[in-house]
Amino acid sequence: MLASVSEGLAKRTSKALLMSRVRVLVGTRKGAFVLTADGKRASWSIEGPHFPGWEIYHVKGSPVDPNRIYASQTSTWFGQVMQRSNDGGATWDVLGNTFAYDGVTGTHQWYDGTPHRWDFARVWHLEPSLHDPDTVYAGVEDAALFRSTDGGATWSELSALRTHGTASQWQPGAGGMCLHTILIDPQHPQRMYAAISAAGAFRSDDAGASWTPINRGLRSEQIPDHDAEVGHCVHRLALHPARPNVLFMQKHWDVMRSDDGGDMWYEISGNLPTDFGFPIDVHAHEPDTIYVVPITSDSYHYPPDGKLRVYRSRCGGNEWEPLTNGLPQRNCYVNVLRDAMAVDTLDACGIYFGTTGGSVYVSPDGGDRWDEIVRDLPAVLSVEVQTLA
């Protein structure tokens, strides 16, 4: 009897996996790619490149309507182009491409500490609304936050962030002064988080009307005042939707955690081989299980010892284990960028990441085993995943 019950459960689980689907949205230096599979995540269909030859900094789908996908297409020669798909990435429409700072822009600090005028360069990050497929936020370089409420046709700046009293002290990081992370609190819709290289992390409790720096506890040896209110090079923020007051951060150096919405941070780097890196993410069903990819240093943008290793903590930090099964463990000198890691929400949570060497990996079991979905793409800038019924 027990055997038949177990067999029945296994069959139902297998059927559910076959009926489920995942869609992985990959932005690269030379176009976007769409990878799809059933819930087993063993056999993949690869479509693309969409927008060949263009830098696709970010592609992300709406949590309300998974067929609604937004993409940032950019070129130093041709400028910024926004794209939208209403059919899951099969076809695309050009949207509004005007990003105008509101009012007098003022200045921020340049690399040498001199004043520098705000100049729009590109859209780094897109964050669709949790409730409305026509509302989407855009984080841009030079750092500012924009919003569209008409599906990307027009964009308006939420200027309270850029005009914050500390903005004149902000400086670009090595990749520019970019607003690269936008998080929306699913339990408190008025609360948002933004992260800027190299200004730090900020929180709004009124849907972007005002902002507070949330950098207490951060320490950065690279800036004159190591404990300054702003000026920290935050690489990425992450939260779990069931516990949005707990934030995780990958900083230029240091992996950090806050248990009070960013009011105070403490270090959780623990036994990592190096605490420099770019992405950080949280398991879909385990709020204390987090993932990072240690990189040797800010001078050597490749994994320690040429071994590509994701590290997992099951206790919210400090205690980390290397995840290597299926990943190259010799002569691997790639980087994993800040937007290039994502998780799905299937029962067996899948973890995904892409490399500057053009590989995209999946772990269908929370990191225990890795499979290479595709290789030899252009350098991967972003990875997002949609879990489809």
Residue ranges and their predicted role:
Residues 1-389:
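Extracellular glycan-interacting surfaces
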